[in-house]
Amino acid sequence: DRNPADGLRMTVSAGANVGERLMAVGERHYGNIRSTATEWLGRVEIASDRIDDQPRAFSGGMRQRLQIARNLVTAPRLVFMDEPTGGLDVSVQARLLDLLRGLVSDLGLSVVIVTHDLAVARLLSHRIMVMKDGHIVEQGLTDRVLDDPQAPYTQLLVSSILQV
């Protein structure tokens, strides 16, 4: 099972987790680091008064959002997400997906998402690639592939979701 703490330093503050990424790309001014970290905590819906709290005091959903801030603060051109909602309660997943969708749109990010959850793929992806045993079985625009799957394996995936 996924652990949202992966990639976070649990013994330093939320602000430091974000700030470390800025320092890694050359930012040295403490005031700038702290204000940018505060801004990014807000963007991922973590209250600014939690900036000095350690991630171990956060819920799984908050840790996941902190990880998002940490990874996006340096404005990468490409982001890789491996099961971004894995290990989270369904109620938390919907909010996280909504947040991710907004950030991807606002920042104009290119994102590669690995997921077994077709709802996640539908919400976050313009294009989809369905793989089985390491081989591509179907690819194309997400809505087309999921609404009218051509490959038998894709048809099976889509129909198994509909029967749940």
Regions found by a protein language model. Give the residues of each.
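A short, surface-exposed alpha-helical micro-motif characterized by mixed small hydrophobic
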Residues: 121-123
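ABC ATPase "signature
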Residues: 139-140
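C-terminal boundary and immediately downstream tail of ABC-type ATPase nucleotide-binding domains
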Residues: 45-46, 146-164
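Conserved catalytic motifs of ABC-family nucleotide-binding domains
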Residues: 75
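Conserved ABC ATPase signature
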Residues: 54-58, 62
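Conserved ABC ATPase "signature" region
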Residues: 32-49, 158-159
